[in-house]
């Protein structure tokens, strides 16, 4: 039962991993700005990051409840993670559209152009479809990989998401980054990896034989590439269309993801849908937790896509990969927990990378 709960919890955690993504003081890759404008960007970044972190805390509570709490006298646990993902996608699409209407109404009130069309061109539709497809495939691959690789390998892979992201931006979309940006990415990746290595207790995967580990590593690698494709393509959408905002992408992406996962539930994953319907009939209270989980995810996505629109995917992914480390640092302060020497070295590497980027940005401005 503990193994089942661990897998189910990992699967639901991947739902937030897909939409989430992170924190550095690199504000944008646009032209140098005035000090006043830079301060405004810092405030915006703090608000976005605080919103993302707060939403993760709420997600964690509801995730724990759905993944581990037995429902009813028969003590059944809900295992239909794809159903949860589908509900969350449609709820986030609705919240995104409401937020889009609000932001565009404010633009119109200022005499600016109003654009409430989510798919304003075939290019936008194609790019969002690509993102939705890659995002929908990445989570199941990552979850399946847990059967063949150990826990430490899995979380180390998640710590290295910045590398495939930048690699795809350079090779696929011909983006150019200053040399210091590569150094920052390496420092942050090494720091988070060290923090993970010197903390995680080894946990065996259910199928962790040597003959299966190569297969599991392959699944993890494909999942990381799909994550990189998701985030780099989102960046490209904003760069190619000045009228596209965070709410546009949030609404369109979640709508398409919901459609894809619904098709999957009606075809390849029909047994999961049937099981979920039967479970909900017996334990209707599960719907309350699923809807609350979806709404919390939708609110979190408002901050996520605001970060993506204003600061880019590199910042967003950095927030994601450093989130666990900052959470543990808070526990050190509040509960007097102790970190190992290796973990402190990892923290120093992360803050060194962030501080170096901040210094380069101020020097540039």
From Swiss-Prot:
Its main location: endoplasmic reticulum. GO terms for biological process: UDP-galactose transmembrane transport; UDP-glucose transmembrane transport into endoplasmic reticulum. The chain crosses the membrane at residues 42-62, 80-100, 182-202, 206-226, 249-269, 289-309, 315-335, 339-359. SUPFAM superfamilies: Multidrug resistance efflux transporter EmrE (SSF103481). It is found in: Endoplasmic reticulum membrane. Pfam families: UAA. It is a multi-pass membrane protein. One of its GO terms (molecular function) is UDP-glucose transmembrane transporter activity. GO terms for cellular component: endoplasmic reticulum membrane; Golgi membrane. Glycans are attached at residues 115, 231. The keyword Membrane applies. It comes from the Eukaryota. The keyword tRNA processing does not apply. Keywords: Endoplasmic reticulum, Glycoprotein, Membrane, Sugar transport, Transmembrane, Transmembrane helix, Transport. InterPro entries: SCL35B1-4/HUT1. Belongs to the nucleotide-sugar transporter family. SLC35B subfamily. May be involved in specific transport of UDP-Gal from the cytosol to the Golgi lumen. Involved in the maintenance of optimal conditions for the folding of secretory pathway proteins in the endoplasmic reticulum. PANTHER family: SOLUTE CARRIER FAMILY 35 MEMBER B (PTHR10778), SOLUTE CARRIER FAMILY 35 MEMBER B1 (PTHR10778:SF10). This is UDP-galactose transporter homolog 1. It comes from Yarrowia lipolytica (strain CLIB 122 / E 150) (Yeast). The lineage of its organism: Eukaryota, Fungi, Dikarya, Ascomycota, Saccharomycotina.
């Amino acid at each position: 039962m503990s193994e089942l709960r661990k897998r189910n919890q990992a699967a639901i955690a991947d739902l937030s991993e897909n939409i989430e993504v992170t924190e550095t003081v690199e504000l944008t890759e646009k032209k140098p700005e005035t000090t006043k404008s830079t301060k405004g960007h810092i405030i915006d970044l703090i608000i976005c990051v605080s919103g993302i972190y707060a939403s993760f805390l709420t997600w964690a509570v509801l995730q724990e409840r759905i993944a581990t709490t037995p429902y009813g006298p028969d003590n059944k646990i809900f295992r239909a993670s794809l159903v949860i993902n589908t509900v969350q996608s449609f709820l986030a699409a609705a919240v995104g559209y409401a937020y889009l209407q609000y932001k565009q109404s404010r633009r119109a009130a200022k005499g600016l152009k109003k654009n409430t069309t989510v798919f304003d061109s075939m290019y936008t539709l194609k790019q969002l479809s690509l993102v939705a497809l890659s995002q929908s495939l990445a989570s199941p691959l990552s979850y399946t990989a847990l059967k063949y690789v150990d826990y430490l390998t899995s979380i180390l892979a998640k710590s290295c998401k910045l590398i495939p992201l930048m690699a795809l931006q350079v090779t696929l979309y011909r983006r150019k980054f200053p040399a210091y940006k590569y150094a920052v990415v390496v420092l942050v990746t090494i720091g988070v990896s060290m923090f993970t290595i010197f903390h995680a207790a080894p946990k065996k995967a259910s199928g962790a034989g040597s003959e299966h580990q190569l297969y599991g590593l392959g699944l993890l690698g494909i999942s990381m590439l799909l994550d990189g494709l998701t985030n780099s393509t989102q960046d490209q959408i904003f760069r190619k269309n000045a009228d596209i905002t965070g709410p546009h992408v949030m609404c369109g992406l979640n709508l398409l993801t919901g459609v894809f996962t619904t098709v999957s539930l009606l075809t390849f994953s029909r047994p999961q849908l049937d099981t979920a319907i039967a479970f909900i009939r017996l334990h209707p209270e599960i719907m309350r937790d699923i809807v609350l989980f979806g709404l919390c995810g939708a609110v979190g996505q408002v901050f996520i896509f605001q970060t993506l629109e204003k600061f880019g995917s590199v910042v967003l992914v950095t927030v994601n990969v450093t989130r666990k480390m900052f959470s543990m640092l808070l526990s050190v302060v509040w509960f007097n927990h102790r970190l190992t020497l290796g973990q402190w070295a990892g923290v120093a590497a992360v803050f060194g990378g962030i501080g170096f980027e901040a210094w380069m940005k101020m020097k540039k401005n």
